């Protein structure tokens, strides 16, 4: 469903430890349902691979699974206001994978996902106090909280991925 994000791992903003706790999470997708298809913008059109992701609430976060395999991804939506969230994700946490960060806007029946691409962040400039850049990789320094993500949300490219509910 959103496995494309992890195909980009090493190219998106990440951290080795979580920046946000379970208590900060919100079940942002609850009004939309539990089954979603991931779509990516290609040549001005939304296109899907048809894979359905199942978002199961667990406390104040989601566990994303699919009918195709037993891999899971933990997703924590941390509210920033106005239906905008920092999305903290960890693919198959049993293996100690890094946490990856996106910006999610939940509106109009979709969750629009904006990738925090390292090359794009480097071009913005002035982020060296908060983000360590190493080639095409980047990681958060310390724990800047929501302030960093609120700032980035206003500067990054529009969403190129979205989650669409499946009935």
Q: What function would you assign to each model-found segment?
A:
Residues 12-32, 39-50, 56-167:
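Calycin-type beta-barrel ligand-binding domains and close structural analogs
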């Amino acid at each position: 469903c959103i496995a494309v994000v992890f195909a980009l791992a090493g190219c998106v903003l990440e951290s080795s430890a979580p920046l946000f706790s379970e208590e900060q999470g919100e079940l942002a997708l609850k009004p939309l349902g539990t089954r979603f298809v991931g779509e990516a913008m290609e040549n001005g059109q939304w296109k899907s691979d048809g894979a359905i992701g199942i978002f199961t609430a667990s406390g104040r976060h989601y566990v994303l699974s699919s009918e195709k395999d037993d891999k899971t991804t933990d997703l924590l939506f941390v509210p920033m206001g106005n239906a905008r969230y920092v999305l903290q994700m960890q693919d198959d946490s049993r293996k100690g994978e890094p946490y990856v960060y996106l910006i999610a806007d939940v509106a109009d029946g979709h969750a629009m996902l904006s990738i925090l691409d390292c090359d794009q962040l480097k071009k913005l400039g002035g982020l060296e106090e908060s983000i360590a850049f190493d080639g095409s990789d980047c990681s958060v320094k310390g724990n800047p909280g929501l302030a960093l993500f609120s700032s980035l949300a206003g500067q990054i490219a529009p969403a190129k991925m979205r989650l669409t509910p499946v009935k």
